[in-house]
Curated annotation (Swiss-Prot):
Residues carrying the site annotation Reversibly protonated during proton transport: 56
Molecular function terms from GO: lipid binding; proton-transporting ATP synthase activity, rotational mechanism
This protein's encoding gene: atpE
Residues annotated as transmembrane: 1-21, 49-69
Organism this protein belongs to: Bacillus cytotoxicus (strain DSM 22905 / CIP 110041 / 391-98 / NVH 391-98)
Protein name: ATP synthase subunit c
Disulfide linkage: none
Role of this protein: F(1)F(0) ATP synthase produces ATP from ADP in the presence of a proton or sodium gradient. F-type ATPases consist of two structural domains, F(1) containing the extramembraneous catalytic core and F(0) containing the membrane proton channel, linked together by a central stalk and a peripheral stalk. During catalysis, ATP synthesis in the catalytic domain of F(1) is coupled via a rotary mechanism of the central stalk subunits to proton translocation.
InterPro entries associated with the record: ATP_synth_csu_bac/chlpt, ATP_synth_F0_csu, ATP_synth_F0_csu_DDCD_BS, ATP_synth_F0_csu_sf, ATPase_proteolipid_c-like_dom, F/V-ATP_Csub_sf
Keywords for the protein's UniProt record, in alphabetical order: ATP synthesis, Cell membrane, CF(0), Hydrogen ion transport, Ion transport, Lipid-binding, Membrane, Transmembrane, Transmembrane helix, Transport
PANTHER family reported for this sequence: ATP SYNTHASE LIPID-BINDING PROTEIN, MITOCHONDRIAL, ATPASE PROTEIN 9
């Protein structure tokens, strides 16, 4: 097994771990905000989806980097 494959696995795993933690924090804070001010549910939900989309970009970048590292 080459070091490129190990590096790719680490890159994908860490990016997925980071995204999972980030998504959990974003959603939990949104739920707290809606519980405090239910009238802002729509605005908070929109901001939450934008935040989740930005956080999910990291694993995609991690996979791209993993493919680049594997092909070297």
């Amino acid at each position: 097994m080459s070091l490129g494959v190990i590096a790719a696995a680490i890159a994908i795993g860490l990016s997925a771990l980071g995204a999972g933690i980030g998504n959990g924090l974003i959603v939990s804070r949104t739920i707290e905000g809606v519980a405090r001010q239910p009238e802002l549910k729509g605005a908070l939900q929109t901001i939450m989806f934008i935040g989740v989309a930005l956080v999910e970009a990291l694993p995609i970048i991690g996979v791209v980097i993993a493919f680049i590292v594997m092909n070297r």
